[in-house]
Regions:
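Non-heme Fe(II)-dependent double-stranded beta-helix
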Residues: 1-15, 21-115, 121-124
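Double-stranded beta-helix
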Residues: 10, 140-199, 219
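Non-heme Fe(II)/2-oxoglutarate
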Residues: 33, 39-42, 46-50, 194, ...
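Active-site region of the double-stranded beta-helix
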Residues: 94, 120-127, 136-146, 153-154
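Generic beta-strand structural signal
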Residues: 94-101, 111-113, 129-135, 145, ...
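Active-site glycine-rich loop that binds ribose-phosphate moieties when present
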Residues: 113-121, 135, 167-174
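A short beta-loop-beta micro-motif enriched in histidine and acidic residues
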Residues: 118-130, 175-176, 182, 205-206
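Short, conserved beta-strand element in jelly-roll/cupin
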Residues: 125-142, 181, 189, 213-217
């Protein structure tokens, strides 16, 4: 894996996102696929990694796994490796610190994610700016719900929102959304102000993707505190108290996604 070119940095500066096709080699891509299959096979475990589910095609199916780095050393080493750190430092303007990690599985029939910006959900600790690294594990196409971005708005700040924290529908309907169709091993970096969404998976195969969010090191290291607060306010199913209402935290911790 190599660092980025000056022309690629200019693309980042103009658009707020940077797509690097084929950036991982075959060995790295194969390792990621294997590790994600391991995560999927892990049982639900209160107090440890978080597994999230959705209702799709009349059944409960895996939607997301997060907070897994303390339990998977190889994954942790990869995501803090020099090559990724070097790219992030160039994009951030300083050293980056890992803030949160997740895998969205979007299995066959899985629902899409509503249009939103990440920034409102990422500023809990007074941080000013985040970058998310997306790694495509499976081919991401229009049919299976690839990521789509609305270009030209990352420098605008927070955009008009609906009551649930997703983007205002009238604003969404006026935008031209660009689908980013990716292959396994492609990387996509995007900042927390880029409007994005994805459609449902209408294929018979998964569209798995790794998402890792980083913040500038000068804004502090809050990964552990973030997941502790999320677990307390919006825990996974296996930790929930029967009859308790967790909806108040949904706009912060369940923004625009199909998790039940």
């Amino acid at each position: 894996m190599n660092a980025i070119l000056d022309t690629q940095y200019e693309q980042w500066r103009r658009h707020g996102y940077l797509w690097l096709p084929g950036h991982l080699n075959a060995s790295e891509t194969s390792s990621l696929m294997r590790w994600i299959e391991e995560l999927a096979a892990w049982p639900e475990a209160p107090g440890k990694w978080m597994k999230w589910y959705e209702q799709a095609r009349g059944r409960r199916q895996l939607c997301r796994v997060e907070d897994f780095l303390p339990y998977h050393a190889a994954f942790a080493e990869f995501l803090n490796a020099g090559a990724i750190a070097e790219i992030l430092e160039r994009l951030c303007g300083e050293r980056a610190t890992l803030f949160k990690e997740k895998v969205n599985f979007k299995l066959a029939g899985g629902a899409g994610f509503e249009p939103h910006q990440d920034a409102p959900a990422f500023t809990t600790f007074g941080q000013r700016y985040h970058i998310t690294l997306m790694v495509s594990i499976d081919p991401a196409t229009r049919e299976n719900g690839c990521l789509e971005v609305a270009d030209g708005h990352h420098g605008t700040g927070l955009l008009p929102q609906a009551n649930d924290g997703t983007l205002d529908r009238a604003w969404v309907d006026r935008q031209l959304w660009r689908p980013i169709e990716m292959q396994p091993g492609d990387l996509l970096f995007f900042d927390s102000y880029v409007p994005h969404r994805s459609g449902a998976n209408r294929s018979d195969r998964p569209r798995r993707a790794l998402y890792v969010t980083y913040n500038r090191a000068s804004d502090g290291d809050y990964r552990g505190e973030y997941f502790a607060k999320k677990r307390a306010a919006f825990p996974p199913e296996c930790e929930r108290v029967a009859g308790k209402d967790y909806s108040a935290a949904a706009s912060l911790y369940n923004l625009g996604n199909p998790i039940t």
